[in-house]
Amino acid sequence: MRALRDRAGLLLCVLLLAALLEAALGLPVKKPRLRGPRPGSLTRLAEVSASPDPRPLKEEEEAPLLPRTHLQAEPHQHGCWTVTEPAAMTPGNATPPRTPEVTPLRLELQKLPGLANTTLSTPNPDTQASASPDPRPLREEEEARLLPRTHLQAELHQHGCWTVTEPAALTPGNATPPRTQEVTPLLLELQKLPELVHATLSTPNPDNQVTIKVVEDPQAEVSIDLLAEPSNPPPQDTLSWLPALWSFLWGDYKGEEKDRAPGEKGEEKEEDEDYPSEDIEGEDQEDKEEDEEEQALWFNGTTDNWDQGWLAPGDWVFKDSVSYDYEPQKEWSPWSPCSGNCSTGKQQRTRPCGYGCTATETRTCDLPSCPGTEDKDTLGLPSEEWKLLARNATDMHDQDVDSCEKWLNCKSDFLIKYLSQMLRDLPSCPCAYPLEAMDSPVSLQDEHQGRSFRWRDASGPRERLDIYQPTARFCLRSMLSGESSTLAAQHCCYDEDSRLLTRGKGAGMPNLISTDFSPKLHFKFDTTPWILCKGDWSRLHAVLPPNNGRACTDNPLEEEYLAQLQEAKEY
């Protein structure tokens, strides 16, 4: 009987301990049978509750309507957890998650890998977590499930339990902004997991796309346009001035040889006796060929006659004396027959200049005058006037003749006409130097002409301001355009204070030939007179006075100007 009492007491103690354990932990002693998963499927956590009133069936039916359910650990009235694994579903075809066997939550969670020492499962590293002490209404929870990518939220409810929600992928139509993150114990617990040591809980959405739109700089486009100018060809009569200017300055040197006296030829022969005749003939032949090529190059252009139209900026760079082609240049072909029957025509010759390249040279040929045009040439200039210009140009190089005075007193109707047209169409000099012109060409409005003109800086080392404009610090030169009626350009110079020099040795003069067209022709037409006059700017200014069309203040002052004038006379 005593053994029976001991056994009964032991049984009562076991029952008492089981009751106390059930009351203390709130864990089920018996596993209720629920609609379990299909045999052989993966075990999934479902809603688990130890309370006598389980979750309503209506809520379980609404859960499959979500495009992607949330992993939720939600305590109910008796401090229990509700865990739901995310199910990948499409709207309209959702299936309810499978419910595994009901077991104690703590034992099931500890069986998961990586959660031996934690109370939560390993979250998605792309999720975000936030916690708030206030409970959220059921309606707000349902709306949160409709987010395109909700945050991993752990919210404390009435009985101190947590609700854990995994991000759900929905359509972007019902997106709402994510809630602000807060530092909570849950975040600290998540960061302790080995898989999340180096992970960022606020990792941005990897599905985001970044579009980079390249916007072209308008300033770069302007710079390109500046290099491409001039885009419009000027009137045809602009280039028609050039042949007459060439003839005016240099003339035809053949007439000089015919006018020499027999004694002069004899003196040359005596001087040549000291050298072999073969060397002299070879040098004369080379000089003759160079003169013919140069004359044909300047007078007729590198590709065709001047009548072919405007030359592109790249064509304005004439041949350099230094050749960078290491292959020996081939000989020119014979000149082609003259293209005309009377008056003037054209001749061409060619030579290979490389693979697929042929250089062409053109020159004019003189033919008997056509009937009715004996007294006029193609430019409308009398033939006698051509001879007079040639004779004047020849006399300029005579040591016994004052070349400067000869040039200044040249009474040519053609030159007068050209100068008149040039001075009438050129823009007026700005009273102040535009500093932006040092970097790129500028456009300035000219009130007298009623349109804008392009100007470029002319203060570079090649301009040699220290020689030709010694008191100038800056210079400007107008650019040719489609509206230019001549090949001339306005030249303006300024002092150190960027003020226009209206007189004196530093003032600029209008240029007969613009450097935009040809720097070499500009030197021969505009710089050569300065050399012939031996730097006496006062004599040159008498023919081509510096421009002051905007009535700028006289610069330099009267006293300094008179001192410069006296210096020029004595020099």
Swiss-Prot record:
One of its GO terms (cellular component) is extracellular region. It is found in: Secreted. Residues 396-559 form the AMOP domain. Residues 327-371 form the TSP type-1 domain. It holds the Pfam family AMOP. Disulfide bonds join 338-365, 342-370, 353-357. PROSITE patterns: AMOP, TSP1. InterPro entries: AMOP_dom, Angio_Inhib/Adhesion_GPCR, TSP1_rpt, TSP1_rpt_sf. Keywords: Disulfide bond, Glycoprotein, Secreted, Signal. It comes from the Eukaryota. Glycans are attached at residues 117, 300, 392. Expressed at high levels in the placenta and at moderate levels in the pancreas, kidney, heart, liver, lung, brain and skeletal muscle. Residues 269-294 have a biased composition (Acidic residues). Residues 1-26 form the signal peptide. Residues 257-268 have a biased composition (Basic and acidic residues). Its main location: secreted. Residues 30-60, 116-141, 257-294 are annotated as: Disordered. Belongs to the isthmin family. This is Isthmin-2. The lineage of its organism: Eukaryota, Metazoa, Chordata, Craniata, Vertebrata.
